[in-house]
Amino acid sequence: MPTTRTTLGAILAVATVLAAAPGLAQRPAAPAPPQQQHRVATPQNQHVRAAGLRLWYRQPAADWNQALPIGSGRLGAMVFGGVVEERIQLNEDSVWAGEVRDRINPAAREALPQVRRLIAEGRPIEAEALADTAIISIPRRLPPYQTLGDLHLAFADTAGHAAATMTDAVPAGYLRELDLDRAIAVTRVTRGATTFTRTAFASAVDGVIVVRLERAGPDPIAFTARLSRERDATVRTERHDTLLMDGEAITGTGKAGEERRTGVRFHGAVRIIADGGAVRAADGALHVTGARTATILITAATTFRETDPAAACARMIAAAAKRPVQALQAAHEADHQRLFGRVSLRIGDDLSDLPTDERLARVIAGGDDPGLAALYFQYGRYLLIASSRPGSLPANLQGRWNALLSPPWGSKYTININTQMNYWPAEVTNLGELHAPLFDLIDIARVDGRRVAREMYGARGFVLHHNTDLWGHAVPIDGARYGIWQMGGAWLSLHLWDHYDFTRDQAFLRTRAWPVMREAAEFLLDYLQEDASGRLLSGPSSSPENQYRLPNGQVATLAIGASMDAQIAHALFTRLLAAGGVLNEDAAFLDRVRAARAKLPAPAIGRHGQLQEWAEDYDEPEPGHRHISHLFALHPGTQVTPRGTPDLARAARVTLERRLANGGGHTGWSRAWIINFWARLEDAGEAHAHLRALLAKSTLPNLFDNHPPFQIDGNFGGTAGIAEMLLQSHAGEIALLPALPAAWPAGAVTGLVARGNVELDITWEAGRATRVVLRPRAGGTHIVRPPRGQAVASVDEDGRRVPALPRADGAVDIALTTGRTYVVTFR
């Protein structure tokens, strides 16, 4: 089997070799970016740059969890801000071990009906043992995402002494900050009469990371630069001013049934341009002396995209080196502001004069800081911009930032919630085009997903289980307790519908969303089995990563009819029917979908008053489990709503209360999901309490989410939860301030987006909305629900009064015309 050392398009070539195995389909070339309806910042929603939108500290990062992230989507870096030595940990999104290969367990097709039979006979323990050996993939795990390496800058003092002889004591006036508005990390160190400033940013425009070193004072800039990686790489110098690294992302032992020792080949390049000094290469490092300023250009590439990564890096470095650093920075800032500047949020007092770690410590000690919540909200948006751009890979478990060769859970795409949570804030916080990398990965994974559906399940369409990687593998991995769950593809397909629902881009719906949703539904139509009472149930499956207790006291995982499966199927079928209506698609197919939806079990209320997690009313041995999968119908689904299904909403509340009473929410991402649940239940107090808990219990000094360890999903889930507290549009209406906490009595948000492609600004005082501005990008009549206890007083269209038709429940209908501006006031 040849090693995969090819471009993304040449995944085709590797898959062609693999296709010699019966039924093994080849991978597609890199898909074109989806058609997007870009939202451009306008004078109405372009907020004034605020000094408060920064993370800042009085000391360098003591460890990786204190370093500050920058990223361009494809490239990422963690900046430590050292005094004597700067460490910049580097990532490139496709530095990934492994290869395209057939991972299907050859015994799976024959074992599947046996596993189903054992579960039906009340023998799920035996079923799990069989599935673990006969269905789980070979090898059992997927390879990891890896660090590129580290750039170390060892500074010399004014007398030219090396860093090893200098003190690393933090000097007075030290500053380390991350400016979210400009996407720039700054370190400022004063020694004697000279202040040294280091500015770092990752440019999506120019494909490079830039580090600018400047001084104010008499002493010159002097340092030694080295590249390093723990293993599987070599470093050399080129010319007098360039460091080069070549390596391969390798994992595994190469033994039979295990991962082969192969992965993408990568190349990294660093060039230093000094003004007024000298740069020389010696001992595998670059030495800068006597400089007034120095500019470091960093880039990397791999064989995932490039046939010749070294040549690609040379082109990017050469192009960037021709431009003044001021032009590189201006282009970077403009590109970042085009996205980041669309949304602003103001709540609480401005405490930005306090260091970020001190503000976090106050919250941990029991204090409240609404402004820190606003900063956290914008930090989530910043991180999505930095880790997911059209043309990059999607944000993985750690976004783009990983310092390890074998990171926790492989830093992969865990698609039983974590990857989906990464993209919850994309549409509502006006970053819809950043969804594109996820759609591209789905297209890649569909290829293996079709083969797995056909060869493992005898089904049409495509299936994904609980994990995938940059190669798009679709097999069940890790073990039966985790891997035997077939709803990953169906859940991911809902993200394409969401993008349509927020943009109303029918071309996207037809060309990108419909094919994926249809194939996901085709699999479910074949996979779901009808029981004796006529219900369509999944199985063998599981409620992600959770277990249930049998009447005899045994604990099992595999089941027939996990509630989440039915809820995801219901969501997919419902959206597919809506899409078919918009597109006037295959009526016969839609009739099958409609008939199948009618046979899905509705969410059931168990003996504790809770929503059942399985078709049977089982108890679980871990009642505070981190996954709360059976509340999918509440969030991100829409099947359960307080007004539409009040009984189910009450049962969802009981479910949350029981989980929390038993220690639930103990992981960062789980706590973030809980914020969203309470916001959907319109319980502002609980949503706010869990936002504070997320900050106090699951947030690292650099505001990264702490599972523990770091996972980025909690950051994105927290940002989405704050948005849900301020605006909801999932229930067929635009609900204003549905979960506004008393702790935020006054504030304003601009640039949020509601389904139907309506951009909104909301201002409130004394806990009551005072003014809402609607900017529709797609026309139509919308139901607008004012905040609880308020009513719409007037609606003006470009300064002219227009009618708002009242509904019996207090909401109003407003006809919106594309391109107009509507101002709503309240009483």
Predicted features and spans:
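Extended, hydrophobic alpha-helical segments in both membrane/secreted and soluble proteins
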Residues: 418, 485-499, 512-526, 670-673, ...
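C-terminal capping/lid segments that line or modulate ligand- or cofactor-binding pockets
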Residues: 67-89, 94, 135, 147, ...
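Bacterial N-terminal signal peptides
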Residues: 9-19
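Asparagine-centered strand-capping/turn motif at beta-strand->loop junctions
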Residues: 215, 774-776
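Bacterial N-terminal signal peptides that target proteins for export
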Residues: 1-11
